[in-house]
């Protein structure tokens, strides 16, 4: 049986590559048919030539993440293993080498699936990109990473993050407190993504300067946004009028990403989703990309993927 031994600086580095968890090595054997043992500063692989090649590149990818300062937890191991098994070594290399740098003090962000990589490439190539699909596919997170990277590289002069405050019917004037207090609950997911990728003091500084703006969709009306990276999140809860208003805000040197889940519409019955209409009307317009995610792109808890699959099957049977 073919074998190959991978050598590392010390035992700690070798064990970090599988998060000090023997069950991850067990998963490797179950998924690739490769037995992996680790002692001191090495990992020994035993199995078929193809399996060893895939396993070797799995560890090369994880080591690259470690060197970049990114953690290797059970979920990172599982994502990389899933890619190298189903998509192959070449795709794993593509994902590893495409690290989006958001700040000098942060390790950066990489796509975890082939679908996510396609999404990043679409954002790079198009001025308007739609990311449509179920929760947990990284639509918003990756868009925020691309926005911060564009700001860092001087490609844009500001970032604008927005989403409909549909729970309040956009009637924020009727809520108690100042504007910041009113909008914070609706915009928290966008702020969470920012804090993952940029130190808090930098976020505050950029917010005070107006370089980063987080605001409800209603506050976009009447503006022309030049040299900006604009993200509309939860776009399924924008009305058709709001979506058209948002899309026509785009000015010179700007890029927009619109994300949403067409199965999670919270609008009143008399309102139509702007995302559904835009998806249908704009998908073949030159300069606009529409990326459709599937349950295979879910990168949350493994159960989330199975939950989405179960609901899809249930809804399909109801239609029949």
Regions found by a protein language model. Give the residues of each.
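Interdomain "pre-motor" coupling segment immediately N-terminal to P-loop NTPase/helicase cores
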Residues: 37-96
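Conserved adenine-nucleotide phosphate-binding loops and their immediately adjacent elements
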Residues: 96-108
């Amino acid at each position: 049986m073919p074998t190959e031994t991978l050598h590392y600086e010390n035992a700690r580095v070798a064990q970090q590559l599988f998060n000090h968890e023997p069950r991850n090595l067990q998963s490797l054997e179950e998924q690739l048919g490769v037995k992996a043992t680790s002692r001191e500063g090495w990992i020994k692989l035993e199995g078929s030539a193809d399996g060893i090649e895939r396993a070797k590149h799995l560890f090369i990818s994880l080591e690259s993440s470690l060197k970049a300062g990114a953690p290797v937890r059970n979920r990172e191991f599982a994502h990389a293993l899933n890619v190298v098994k189903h998509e192959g070594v070449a795709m794993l290399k593509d994902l590893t080498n495409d690290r989006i740098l958001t700040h000098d003090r942060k390790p950066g962000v990489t796509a975890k699936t082939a679908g996510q990589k396609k999404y990043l490439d679409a954002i790079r190539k198009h001025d308007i990109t739609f990311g449509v699909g179920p929760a947990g596919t990284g639509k918003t997170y990756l868009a925020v990473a691309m926005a911060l990277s564009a700001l860092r590289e001087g490609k844009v002069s500001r970032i604008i993050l927005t989403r409909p405050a549909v729970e309040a019917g956009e009637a924020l004037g009727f809520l108690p407190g100042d504007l910041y207090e009113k909008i914070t609950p609706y915009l928290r997911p966008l702020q969470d993504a920012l804090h993952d990728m940029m130190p808090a003091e930098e976020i505050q500084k950029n917010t005070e300067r107006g370089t980063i703006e987080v605001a409800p969709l209603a506050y976009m009306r009447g503006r022309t946004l030049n040299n900006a990276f604009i993200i509309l999140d939860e776009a399924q809860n924008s009305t058709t009028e709001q979506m058209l208003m948002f899309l026509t805000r785009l000015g010179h040197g700007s890029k927009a990403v619109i994300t949403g889940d067409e199965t999670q519409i919270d609008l009143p019955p008399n309102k139509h989703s702007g995302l559904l209409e835009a998806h249908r009307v704009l998908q073949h317009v030159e300069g606009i990309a529409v990326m459709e995610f599937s349950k295979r792109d879910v990168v949350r808890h493994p159960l989330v993927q199975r939950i989405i699959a179960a609901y899809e099957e249930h809804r399909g049977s109801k239609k029949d």
